[in-house]
Amino acid sequence: MALSYRVSELQSTIPEHILQSTFVHVISSNWSGLQTESIPEEMKQIVEEQGNKLHWAALLILMVIIPTIGGNTLVILAVSLEKKLQYATNYFLMSLAVADLLVGLFVMPIALLTIMFEAMWPLPLVLCPAWLFLDVLFSTASIMHLCAISVDRYIAIKKPIQANQYNSRATAFIKITVVWLISIGIAIPVPIKGIETDVDNPNNITCVLTKERFGDFMLFGSLAAFFTPLAIMIVTYFLTIHALQKKAYLVKNKPPQRLTWLTVSTVFQRDETPCSSPEKVAMLDGSRKDKALPNSGDETLMRRTSTIGKKSVQTISNEQRASKVLGIVFFLFLLMWCPFFITNITLVLCDSCNQTTLQMLLEIFVWIGYVSSGVNPLVYTLFNKTFRDAFGRYITCNYRATKSVKTLRKRSSKIYFRNPMAENSKFFKKHGIRNGINPAMYQSPMRLRSSTIQSSSIILLDTLLLTENEGDKTEEQVSYV
């Protein structure tokens, strides 16, 4: 009969680290005293305990792991497939989504296994330091991406012209590479030191960073991976708010402008003849007395151009809304990661504190930090209509964007050059197409001298969007409307 087996015989067939779990411990400690009539009662209690663990595991899978994997996959697909989303800033978001996706794929499931086995490592020993390394790496990379996005946005608002000049795809990839290298540098001490094992029971380990072996890493790693990015995010957030308030004031109090011919060498430069003069485009600038546009149709032109100031105000409003989103991300960042890193520091510095309680709190708070990997794509993308539309199509397995004729007409623009040779500029044709401007619509004012400029031929360039006076220096941002 099954009841005649001795405990020692049963234990010899079970690995040592599995015997330490509550499930086997309850069986082995009560096996000798079990009677046939008491088996259902004992087994019922064990089944209930394991059932509760399974319920918690299912809850974590449904509420945390699956949304993290699904949401970040949608972000990666959107940036990869949508042409409108393929610019430098969104490459940061895609890299952030990659880091968060890897947390959901490789870190969370194994962390869930450790919960099921009551902190005992259920996998081969060699995988323990590798998993801890990936845990620190991907979580740190997620935090570093948030910090980099915050700094990048502040620079784009404070110095728009300079930021646009260095905001290429190659530059974005360099920045992303630096973020990942910093994250690797912070996490690399974990596999180098390795996990200390018990000599008597080498298979009986808990795969956690202990104070005795990783005390210095836990302290300085927390400073580098969290508190330093936190300080940077706080400073850049308030600087961003200040810069937006200043620009909103400048736009609101800007005097009326007049339409003039103005040479702008920083926007369009001919690449065919090095010695040729820069093209001249019609722009808004009341501070210079260049030759004005023909008087014919002035009233119609000014009615059309009066909307440009409104678009400037609208752009400021959009940036303020984006900064509010940044504030939400900043708040969630504090809410989800502060408890873990504060407890981590306390565990190292406080010798009189209950180490068992702090370790238990760490196991809880780390899952709150994991939740941020699922929240990041929601906060950053659900406020963006292009992302929302893409997500809706991807969920229904439709991976092609549809563009209406009305939308295409709204995006078409006509830009008139005073220099007829400007129409042949390879630079302008290349970048015009990239910005949604049809080269077939280019017309030269030299051809239109004998004709009246129609109201439909208005120049849609707003150079007074973000104008700052810093001493004697004036900066103008040129943007397509």
From Swiss-Prot:
Q: Which Pfam families match?
A: 7tm_1 (PF00001)
Q: Please give the annotated consequence of changing residue 347 to A.
A: No effect on agonist binding
Q: Which UniProt keywords apply?
A: Behavior, Cell membrane, Disulfide bond, G-protein coupled receptor, Glycoprotein, Lipoprotein, Membrane, Palmitate, Receptor, Synapse, Synaptosome, Transducer, Transmembrane, Transmembrane helix
Effect of mutating residue 139 to A:
Slightly decreases agonist binding
Q: Where is this motif: [DE]RFG motif?
A: 212-215
Where in or outside the cell it occurs: the entry states: Cell membrane; Synapse, Synaptosome
Could you list the residues that carry lipid attachment of the S-palmitoyl cysteine kind: 397
Q: What is the effect of changing residue 209 to A?
A: No effect on agonist binding. Strongly increases dissociation of bound lysergic acid diethylamine, without affecting binding affinity
SMART domains recorded: 7TM_GPCR_Srsx
Residue window of motif PDZ-binding: 479-481
Membrane in keyword set:
yes
Instruction: Summarize the protein's role.
Output: G-protein coupled receptor for 5-hydroxytryptamine (serotonin). Also functions as a receptor for various ergot alkaloid derivatives and psychoactive substances. Ligand binding causes a conformation change that triggers signaling via guanine nucleotide-binding proteins (G proteins) and modulates the activity of downstream effectors.
Could you share any additional remarks the record makes about this protein?
A: Binds lysergic acid diethylamine (LSD) in the orthosteric pocket, but is not the principal LSD receptor in the brain. Bound LSD dissociates extremely slowly, with a residence time of about 46 minutes at 37 degrees Celsius.
Please report the name of this protein according to its UniProt entry. Answer: 5-hydroxytryptamine receptor 2B
| Species annotation | Homo sapiens
What lineage is this protein's organism placed in? Eukaryota, Metazoa, Chordata, Craniata, Vertebrata
The record's gene field reads: HTR2B
